[in-house]
Amino acid sequence: MRTYTAYVEFDPETKLYVGVVPGIPGAHTQGVTLDELQKNLKEVLELCLEEYQGAKEDLPRFVGLQLIEIAV
């Protein structure tokens, strides 16, 4: 079993939680609740990784998130 990091935002326009798994092309989804989002992320991640079965080492490697401060 392997653990992946998901970036999650709440979209006030659609009232949905949106999640992206960095480094896995196509691994993004949405849900009405955080629980639904987690279920959907797990499902889409499994589907994406099935596509890369033999070439998982060729996938980009997620390094981390950075906070960027700017004056606005």
Question: What is the predicted role of each segment?
Answer:
Residues P25-D35:
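A short, exposed loop/beta-hairpin motif centered on an aromatic-Gly-Thr core
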Residues M1-T5, E36-V72:
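Short, charged, surface-exposed hinge/linker loops at domain edges
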Residues E9-V21:
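Short aromatic-glycine-(Arg/Gly/Cys) micro-motifs in beta-strand/loop hairpins
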Residues Y4, Y17, A27-T29:
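Structural detector for hydrophobic anchor residues on beta-strands
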Residues V21, G31, I70-V72:
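Hydrophobic residues in beta-strands and at strand termini
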Residues R2-Y4, E13, V32:
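Intrinsically disordered/low-complexity terminal segments and short unstructured peptides
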Residues T14, I24-A27, F62:
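Intrinsically disordered, low-complexity segments enriched in proline/serine/threonine
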